[in-house]
Each structure stands twice: as structure tokens, then as C-alpha cells.
Amino acid sequence: MRTHCCGELSLSVLNQTVCLCGWVDRRRDLGGLIFIDMRDFSGIVQVFFDPEQQALFEQASSLRNEFCIQITGKVKARPHHQINQKMLTGAVEVFSENLTIINCSEPLPLDRNQNNTEEQRLRYRYLDLRRPEMLARLKTRSKITSFVRQFLDKEGFLDVETPTLTKATPEGARDYLVPSRVQKGKFYALPQSPQLFKQLLMVSGVDRYYQIVKCFRDEDLRADRQPEFTQIDIETSFMTAQQVRTVTEKLIRQLWLQIKNIHLGAFPVMTFEEAIRRFGSDKPDLRNPLELVDLDDVLKNVDFKVFSEPANDAHSRVVGIRVPNGADISRKQIDEYTAFVHIYAARGLAWLKIKQADAGLEGIQSPIAKFLSPEILERILKRTQAKDGDLLFFGADKKKIVTDAMGALRLKLGLDRQLTQLDRWAPLWVIDFPMFSNDTETGLTAMHHPFTSPKNTNLSEFAANPETALANAYDMVINGYEVGGGSVRIHHSDLQQQVFSLIGIEANQQKQQFGFLLEALKYGAPPHAGIAFGLDRLVMLLTGTNNIRDVIAFPKTTAAACLMTDAPSFASDSSLQELFIDVVKKEKK
């Protein structure tokens, strides 16, 4: 139906007759002349209709935005003063010789100026995707997946598909369950990840596996989460954690070079402990220069219980954040920051402005100044490296509260004070995660997943101190986003059973849910390790959006609904009967 795409036209096809198909992006009537901007997936070109061709001109006058049309015409050079430098095709235009209206369009339910709610955009997604920036993101996504496949193929990885209908296993989030019509009363689960199958592929001798795969998690959603999402899933045999990091760092560095023409350089490596201590997060945004500074030892003996009590408690923490040139922050703004940390259960936010550092207590402004001695103030200023004109914020409470609250405050201050270098890329590896987290109600839970190997695989030593065990795990973080996470896996059945037992999975449950894995590990399972990257999150970063729904063609809302198709929907009684399912209506209290 066409010889060229709209965005391809240039002076190289001057005076050639072309046939184009696409949509009317805009029609302009200028002093008896009609011009349209014609758009397809490749771009926009200007089309001119000559009023001397009366029938064609009258036909063109009926065109409206988003009519689907076919144009045949000759490519002409625009007069020099009419060249549009903002368009790739701005040096040429098409003199129309024939117009076919393929399909008309009703007035759009979306605002052409893009002042649309997200609900409108999702309800009419097929129209929202016509916008050039949305199509550009889909093109970038396609380039990314194509590059990843080529890279991994060259590195000797084998693309293997794993089942979508599988067995429910506890992996952290709730499963999406699919009832079986054939097996009465039984359910499949949609995979939260191909974790167990890719480990079984290693037992099978596949050696190097990858898959770009859909995963499903029934969890509460955020701006960067979806109930169905896509992973770049990787697993290897006979490779160490360092070797996995090396090959996947190479992948990401080359990907950034391919898509953004940016050299990332070698990724720094940071332990989990250091990340939490300095940045209040296990996915630190290193574009932000602010850090959390521990002050426990400095404030242990201060005559101020808000500081001294947590400073002397092993389960608590006192930290400071130095805001360069922050003394101009108003009391109203300080109150707003105090309200902000309340979100994270912090009880308050102490502050101190440095007017003249070498003037001692006379040189500061702070409601806590009366509790500080000149010696303690000097130690605070030295530890935080505070200077004239700076502001210090203090957090003091249980470790988790302080870490979460001050870590979040650090990020907010970085943006508010324009300290975060938004034009930078700051990747890193975070390693040496705790093997388990300890919940007062549920006991030990796996920090990553229960198939991660501890760094120390000595069974007796591991069993003696599981709370202090480190996982042989690693996360890749870019600009504060965890883009990938992986680990060395357990490849001995007895160690796997021990980990299951530690997190409260009893022997019978182990056999019922993971018997196939425990059995497979007994048949010469090789050492293996892997990683998974969130494709949606990578595309989000590489296209410069902060909403993951912008990089998925047909995403769900935060209520896990598709507004366009009205999914999920009710099933008919006959369908439910076939599946042996009764829907029980909850009685109103």
C-alpha cells in the first residue's frame, strides 16, 4: 500500500513519486492553501494540496485529525525560508496527486495537547500510543530486547522457554492461581519468576540459560510495579558470583552505549551494611552527595535523652545529615521536613544551623543548642564536616526507623536543594546482604529467596549462627533503582532443606512444595548462579520516564485493572461450574 514511510523522506528522494499511508496529525488552511502534517510510526511529513486540482482540494478540505489516509504525490524541496529544522523531514514536502480516505475518525476523547489524566490514557490506550513519545518508548524497548538477545547469544547463552502454568510455591508475593478444568479442585500458579525451572535447567546440563519472560505477582502496586512484568532472566553453571557480575555488567555497559551512547565505566561495589549505614537504603542513589553520618559515640553522654538513649542502645541509631548552604532553609520548610519523616514513623527531626563554626555555641542556631557542650558541638561539626552556612538534620530512634526516615529525607533534600545530579548515571553493585531478616512475629525469612546460598556453606557453622549469615547475593543499582538482582544458588539438597527449616517450612511441606527440586539436587547438581533484570525498569530508565506504565504497551492500573478491556471481569455461571468453583459473596456486617 505504500512505497515509503513518512519519516524517511529527505532530499535524497527529490522529485520521486511516493505513496504514503498514515494519519492526519494536523490540517492547516492558509490563505486558500491546504497543508497537512501526515504521521506514521516513523515520523511526520508535510503534504501540500494544490487548489488548482479542484476535486482533490475539495476532498482534502474534508480531512480531520486522525483520519487514516493514503497519499500519492511527488517529493519537492521546501523553499529555503520554509525549511522546518524541528522536523527530520523539514527540508521537503509532498505535493499530493491522489488522496484516499481509508477511514474517518470521530473526535478524539483525548486532548491533543496531552492534558489527559492517566485514566483517560489507559482507557483509550490505542490512541495514547499514537503519540510520538509513546511510540518512541516502544521502539526503544524493542531495541533493548534485540540487543540483549544478540549479546547473550554471542556469550554462549541458550534461550529456553519455561512453563507459564506451574506449581504454587512461596516466593514472597501472592500467586495468581489458574483453576484446572481437568484436575478437579486443583490450581496452577502463574510464575512469579522462572527461578526453579532455570535451576533445573542447570541440573539438566544446559550450562548457560537466558529468557525474556513474563512474570506475575499479586501484590500491592506502585508507580514502578505491575502485576505482570518482564524479566531478562539469566542462569549459569560453574560460574562464581564475580563472574556473573562481570558478564552482566558488560551487558549493561554495552546496552547503555548502544541506546544512550554513554560510557558507564566500571561499577563500584558496596556492601549492604555500608549502603544502609551511609545512605539509608540498599539501593542508594549515588548521584546525591548527601550521606548519613553516625553520631552514636559522639552523643552517648549528651544531656538530652532524645539523643543519649538511642545512642546507648544497640538496636537504635543517631545520625546526622549535613545540608551544604542549608542555613537559608526556613522554619516553615523545616516543619515540612519534620512532617515528611513522620511518614516513616520518626518522632521528630532535630536541626542545627551553623552561622560561624569557629564561634562555638554562639555561632549556631538550634532549639537543641542548650543541650550541647562546646566540646560535643565541636565533635559534631568535625564528624559531619559542617561549615559556615550549613544546616544539620538529626534523626534518633530505632535503627530501622532512623534508616528509613533519614534515607528518604536524604533523597528529598537532594532533589529540593538541586544537589542530585540528574544528568548523571550512577551504577553500582550491592553485595553481602544478610541471608535472613528476623521478624518478631514470623521469625526468620529469606532476604532474597530461599534458594540463595549463604557465603559460608559449612552446615554446622551456618546452623549455629543463621541470623548473622551473609547471602552470596548481589543487586545491580542504577540511580537509586534496583534494576537487577541475583545470587549463587544452593546446589546441595541437605543445605536447601536446612534453609527451608530455618524459615519455618517443615519437612512435609518441603516435600509437598519443593520435593522435585530437592530430588533433582541429589543427582550431581552443579554449582550455579544467576541474575534477573527488570526489563520494564531498564526501559523506564533509558527512556527518561518515572512511570513504568509509560513503557508497557497495555499496562494495568494500581488496582491491577485494565481500563481499556475492563479486565478482570466476572465469569459466567457455566464457566465456573466447569471449573468446579463457587463464588461466595461476603456478607455485609
Curated annotation (Swiss-Prot):
Binding residues for L-aspartate: 171, 217, 448, 489
List its EC numbers: 6.1.1.12
What is the purpose of this protein? Catalyzes the attachment of L-aspartate to tRNA(Asp) in a two-step reaction: L-aspartate is first activated by ATP to form Asp-AMP and then transferred to the acceptor end of tRNA(Asp).
Aspartate: where is this region?
195-198
Chief place of localization = cytoplasm
Catalytic activity reads: tRNA(Asp) + L-aspartate + ATP = L-aspartyl-tRNA(Asp) + AMP + diphosphate
Query: Which PANTHER family does the record match to this protein?
Result: ASPARTATE--TRNA LIGASE, MITOCHONDRIAL (PTHR22594:SF5), ASPARTYL/LYSYL-TRNA SYNTHETASE (PTHR22594)
Q: Biological process GO annotation list?
A: aspartyl-tRNA aminoacylation
Leading EC class: ligase
The gene designation is: aspS
What are the subcellular locations of this protein?
Cytoplasm
| GO molecular function ontology, one term from the record | aspartate-tRNA ligase activity
* ATP-binding in keyword set: yes
Task: Tell me the residue numbers annotated for binding ATP.
Answer: 217-219, 226, 482, 534-537
Q: What is this protein called?
A: Aspartate--tRNA ligase
Organism, scientific name:
Hamiltonella defensa subsp. Acyrthosiphon pisum (strain 5AT)
Q: CDD domains of this UniProt entry?
A: AspRS_core (cd00777), EcAspRS_like_N (cd04317)
Question: Which proteins does it associate with, and in what oligomeric form?
Answer: Homodimer.
The record's section on InterPro entries has:
Aa-tRNA-synt_II, aa-tRNA-synth_II, aa-tRNA-synth_II/BPL/LPL, Asp-tRNA-ligase_1, Asp-tRNA-ligase_1_N, Asp/Asn-tRNA-synth_IIb, AspRS_core, GAD-like_sf
Q: Cross-referenced HAMAP family, in alphabetical order?
A: Asp_tRNA_synth_type1
Q: Which UniProt keywords apply?
A: Aminoacyl-tRNA synthetase, ATP-binding, Cytoplasm, Ligase, Nucleotide-binding, Protein biosynthesis
* Family affiliation: Belongs to the class-II aminoacyl-tRNA synthetase family. Type 1 subfamily.
